[in-house]
Design a protein with these regions (language model features):
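Short, flexible loop segments at the rims of nucleotide/cofactor-binding pockets, characterized by
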Residues: 58-63, 80-81, 100-102
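Short, acidic/small-residue loops that bind anionic groups at enzyme active sites
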Residues: 95-117
Length: 144
């Protein structure tokens, strides 16, 4: 099985940024520990990470475009599923409309897991915009 994991960041494209390499290495280590034998998980980024992607709508538009352009390669390249691994579950409906393979989203999955573990839960973020986005995702998922 081949799984396409799509980040909303530029990853190696931001080679001058130490945090992008740390993130990429951490994801690779985690995948080694959780992927079943015979499952090929490959992480893809977008062209580059726009400044303010977690704060500004204009920056998010660049992320949306990069994400869709990247993920559209998954099916033709033989991937069996797509996992979107960015906090805001960008382009939820669009990706499910455009692809015939399963598309799952990390925050949606995390919110549903939290519901199974406890009657209430909290989402912690590093700025006000993340709080607003988390609330919007909870509403979208029928949890608020």
């Amino acid at each position: 099985m081949k799984i396409w994991l799509q980040s909303g960041s530029g990853l190696s494209a931001n080679g001058g940024t130490p945090n992008s390499r740390l993130y990429e290495d951490a994801v690779a280590r985690r995948l080694e520990g959780v992927a079943r034998a015979g499952t090929d998980c490959v992480v893809f980024g977008i062209g580059s990470t726009p400044f303010g992607k977690d704060r500004y709508h204009a920056a998010k538009q660049k992320v949306f475009t990069g994400l869709i352009e990247s993920v559209l390669r998954a099916e033709p390249e033989g991937y069996d599923a797509v996992g979107v691994i960015n906090t805001f579950d960008h382009r939820y409906y669009e990706l499910r409309e455009l692809l015939r393979i399963p598309v799952v989203f990390i925050t949606e999955s995390t919110l549903y897991l939290a519901c199974q573990l406890a009657p209430t839960f909290a989402v912690i973020g590093h700025n006000w915009q993340i709080k607003l986005q988390a609330k919007e995702l909870a509403n979208h998922s029928g949890l608020a």
